[in-house]
């Protein structure tokens, strides 16, 4: 053992003590960075967020099929039915690197799965970024600043949130590559660097920039930052031939490789503004180089001004001729945040929102103030590298304010600034502790030696200023993976689980056919493809905004108009995510807004003024005090064919597909549907899966052999039940319903044989409307009601006789009117009327018979001849009857 210790001491004796301490500190920083990013492991070993599931699929594909196969991969799982050309729609840097890491581990005997590699990959990338930031800080301000930069970056909340366990997105590799680009390019331009060294570092910068471009769409930022930096150096009189050489070598390599090696960008990227500035600044460099051969500074300034004007004019011409492509989409919204108001698909994503000063302080805490002090120190020195750091800080600060997710690109320069401030503010304290102040031999009145306790106090204040930022770092890391809480933004308490999406995806995987197509909002596309292994209409790439608008339409239309659209897309299942809570004393639950209950507003905005076929759908919002109401308008051409209220307040009505699914799923509504059958409900009722049914349209017919029969005669009823194309339904039963004199009742249930049914019936008297009712078969055929078969059954005839007790009476004398039916009936009504001219009649009374008879006593109030007649209304199977007219004479 002693010999081994001596051997180790001998081996390390050649290492300078300062260098050894530096390596030790960097190792500790690396371990701290790994440990902090591993904190989410408490909640499970998952990929986090949404995009990492795409990277996992791509990594797995590369491992199984090889790197070159990826460039020919047409993925049929996404954007059904069109699919996606993966090389044209995605960047491959992260997936290729993760696949290479997997292959390397297997080559050295580490038998890890692809999933294990991709879950752990981000934390390694984040830790390596901290080490890279050490070299950046060291090159800019020395070793002390480098070590602090590494520590600040290791514990930076913005960086942690994007490089934590399972967060396999572009940022896990992108920030590391961006920092390396800065290191290589700045080293290429270090004073005293040989041309060979300059070219070497420039080539490394160009290769790394190409690698970043194949990895992260935000590669435009470091690219254009370097271009801007070079332009500023030229315009401020800091031009050197070394700068021209490094610029030419860096972008020569980059422009040669990128159009060929990144299919998503292709050669078309060369006409974009971000790339056209590269040759523009190259011309500026050449003009400045040519100016060095001019005799005076005035001539050089004129040459540079002319070159600048020519470049501006050329850029204007390229824009007018539409040769230059200006930024669009989320890139435009980053440059100009106001344009996102017209981009609902961009604005609907929470990480695309503008940042606030509160969010900056939340991310950087007390380092915010140290960063401001660091800015003061670099402005006071203002070397070339300080100009680069200034430009990097200002531009990243602007973009971070424009897009909250881009606070990440602010992390490296801000960490460097905070490190510089800490070093510069700690220097006096260290000098005091070391007693490094040299006092003159001659005593100077008033000069007092400062004790070491003042140095300790300064260092303690700096530590107190830094520690709060580190505590926020732990809080940023100590959060579960998105899918572990079903994307609900909370940390579950002990014993509480919100794994509704994991349950739903497992159910879809195990209980639906492999060919099933699942319609869901685009947020969940990557989850459904990766974990449920099923096709989706859209995913988080949002590459086809037209199809996303169609999904929004299908969710916001009523089922009658949505089902034909779903059938066109061959939708098998629909999955919705709705968050709610039940409060004691409330009859209905309250929506929380973390699922579609908060996203349907964006569906309305995205679907608004979009068309399907000849139909255009529009949505209108009306506000009355605190109440917000949405209306859905459907137009064909200029004609409004439907105008319905779809919501009152936060809650959607049942007359939209999403409203029906949400309301029935959480128990607000008891509505039913022929098209949607809820087949899965997660444990917390947050994720609902509906099977989409496409029942055949049913056509039922009915007819009778006679439309007019006498009472007691039999009627033969026949009919058919077929689909809309005339194909008969083989078996089943048909309910026959009769509506007689406005009263509906069932006649019988007839059996269906090869699409036909028949029934013999003796109908009661009256006017009949007979219909056939097919109840349908769930998910296969729709219910149907036939057009009515009309029929009249003549009632049993009866006669009515009328007589008077006296036909000649005196005024004031009573007379008895006697009525007799040929049938002894006690239902129906008698009506007795009289007339003085046998034309205009006055009703005397209406009364029911008793056993077919009535004796009515009447005292006339006028003299002369009175004509008297009675009628019977008829009842049941007996018809009406009218008596003859009798005449009575009343004397004065």
Language model features by range: what are they?
Residues 1-41, 50, 133, 147, ...:
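Start-transfer (signal-anchor) and selected internal transmembrane alpha helices
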Residues 271-288, 302-386:
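Alpha-helical transmembrane segments at the extracellular/periplasmic loop-to-helix junctions
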Residues 2-9, 108, 125-131, 434-697:
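Extracytoplasmic
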Residues 15-17, 195-196, 239-245, 294-303, ...:
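Membrane-interface helix-loop-helix junctions at transmembrane boundaries of multi-pass membrane enzymes
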Residues 84-96, 107-131, 164-168, 172:
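Loop-to-helix entry region of an early transmembrane alpha helix in multi-pass inner-membrane enzymes
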Residues 387-390, 395-434, 440-443, 456, ...:
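Hydrophobic/aromatic-rich transmembrane helices and adjacent perimembrane loops
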Residues 16-52, 57-58, 64-70, 74, ...:
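Transmembrane signal-anchor helices characteristic of membrane glycosylation enzymes that use polyprenol
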Residues 29-36, 70-78, 120-139, 144-193, ...:
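Membrane-embedded helix bundles of polyisoprenyl
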């Amino acid at each position: 053992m002693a010999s081994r210790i001596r051997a180790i001491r001998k081996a390390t004796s050649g290492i300078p003590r300062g260098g050894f301490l530096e390596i030790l500190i960097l190792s500790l920083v690396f371990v701290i960075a790994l440990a902090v990013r591993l904190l989410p492991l408490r909640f499970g070993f998952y990929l986090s967020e949404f995009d990492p599931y795409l990277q996992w699929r791509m990594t797995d594909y590369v491992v199984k099929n090889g790197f070159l196969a990826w460039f020919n991969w047409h993925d049929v799982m996404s954007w059904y039915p069109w699919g996606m050309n993966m090389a044209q729609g995605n960047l491959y840097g992260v997936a290729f690197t993760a696949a290479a890491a997997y292959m390397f581990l297997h080559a050295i005997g580490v038998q890890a799965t692809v999933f294990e590699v991709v879950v752990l990959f981000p934390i390694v990338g984040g830790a390596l970024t901290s080490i890279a930031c050490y070299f950046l800080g060291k090159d800019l301000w020395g070793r002390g600043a480098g070590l602090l930069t590494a520590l600040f970056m290791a514990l930076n909340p913005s960086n942690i949130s994007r490089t934590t366990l399972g967060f396999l997105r572009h940022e896990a590799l992108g920030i590391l590559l961006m920092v390396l680009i800065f290191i290589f390019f700045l080293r290429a331009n270090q004073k005293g660097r040989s041309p060979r060294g300059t070219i070497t570092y420039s080539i490394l910068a160009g290769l790394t920039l190409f690698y970043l471009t194949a990895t992260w769409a935000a590669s435009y930022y470091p690219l254009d930052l370097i271009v801007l930096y070079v332009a500023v150096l030229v315009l401020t009189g800091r031009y050197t031939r070394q700068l021209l050489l490094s610029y030419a070598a860096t972008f020569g390599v980059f422009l040669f490789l990128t159009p060929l090696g990144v299919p998503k960008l292709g050669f078309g990227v060369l006409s974009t503004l971000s790339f056209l500035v590269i040759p523009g600044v190259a011309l500026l460099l050449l003009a400045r180089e040519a100016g060095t051969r001019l005799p005076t500074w005035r001539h050089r300034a004129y040459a540079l001004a002319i070159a600048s004007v020519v470049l501006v004019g050329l850029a204007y011409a390229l824009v007018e001729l539409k040769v230059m492509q200006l930024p669009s989409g989320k890139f435009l919204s980053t440059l100009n945040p106001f344009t996102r108001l017209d981009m609902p698909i961009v604005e609907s994503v929470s990480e695309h929102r503008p940042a606030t000063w509160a969010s900056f302080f939340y991310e950087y805490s007390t380092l915010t103030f140290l960063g401001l002090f660091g800015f003061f120190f670099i402005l006071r020195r203002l070397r070339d590298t300080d100009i680069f750091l200034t430009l990097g800080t200002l531009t990243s600060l602007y973009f971070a304010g424009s897009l909250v997710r881009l606070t990440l690109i602010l992390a490296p320069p801000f960490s460097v600034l905070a490190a510089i401030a800490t070093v510069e503010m700690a220097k006096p304290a260290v000098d005091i502790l070391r007693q490094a102040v040299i006092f003159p031999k001659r005593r100077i009145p008033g000069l007092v030696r400062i004790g070491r306790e003042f140095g300790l106090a300064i260092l303690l204040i700096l530590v107190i200023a830094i520690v709060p930022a580190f505590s926020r770092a732990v809080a940023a890391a100590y959060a579960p993976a998105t899918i572990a809480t079903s994307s609900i933004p909370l940390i579950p308490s002990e014993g509480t689980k919100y794994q509704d999406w994991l349950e739903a995806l497992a159910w879809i995987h195990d209980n639906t056919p492999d060919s099933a197509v699942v319609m869901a909002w685009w947020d969940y596309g990557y989850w459904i493809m990766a974990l449920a292994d099923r096709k989706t209409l859209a995913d988080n790439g949002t590459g086809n905004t037209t199809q996303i608008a169609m999904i929004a339409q299908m969710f916001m239309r009523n089922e009658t108009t949505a089902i034909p659209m779903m059938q066109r897309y061959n939708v098998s299942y629909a999955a919705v995510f709705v968050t709610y809570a039940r409060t004691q004393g409330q009859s209905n639950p309250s929506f929380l807004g973390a699922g579609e209950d908060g996203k349907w507003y964006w569906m309305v905005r995205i679907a608004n003024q979009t068309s399907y076929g000849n139909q255009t759908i529009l949505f209108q919002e009306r506000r009355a005090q605190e109440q917000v109401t949405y209306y859905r308008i459907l137009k064909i051409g200029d004609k409004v064919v439907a105008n319905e209220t779809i919501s009152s307040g936060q809650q959607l009505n049942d007359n939209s597909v999403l409203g029906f699914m949400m309301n029935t799923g959480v128990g607000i509504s008891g509505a039913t549907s022929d098209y949607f059958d809820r087949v899965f409900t997660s444990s917390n009722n947050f994720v609902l899966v509906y099977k989409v049914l496409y029942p055949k349209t049913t056509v039922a017919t009915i007819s009778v052999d006679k439309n007019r029969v006498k009472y007691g005669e039999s009627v033969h009823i026949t009919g058919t039940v077929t689909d809309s194309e005339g194909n008969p339904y083989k078996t089943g039963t048909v309910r026959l319903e009769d509506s007689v004199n406005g009263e509906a009742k069932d006649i019988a249930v007839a059996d269906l044989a090869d699409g036909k049914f028949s029934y013999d019936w003796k109908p009661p008297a009256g006017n009949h409307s007979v219909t056939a009712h097919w109840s349908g078969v769930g998910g296969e055929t729709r219910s149907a009601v036939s057009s009515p078969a009309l029929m009249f059954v003549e009632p049993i005839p009866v006669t009515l006789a009328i007589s008077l007790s006296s036909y000649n009476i005196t005024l004031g004398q009573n007379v008895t009117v006697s009525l007799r039916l040929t049938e002894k009936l006690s239902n129906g009504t008698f009506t007795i009327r009289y007339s003085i001219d046998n034309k205009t009649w006055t009703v005397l009374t209406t009364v029911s018979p008793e056993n077919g008879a009535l004796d009515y006593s009447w005292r006339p109030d006028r003299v002369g001849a009175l004509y008297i007649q009675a009628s019977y209304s008829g009842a049941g199977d007996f018809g009406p009857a009218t008596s003859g007219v009798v005449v009575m004479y009343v004397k004065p």
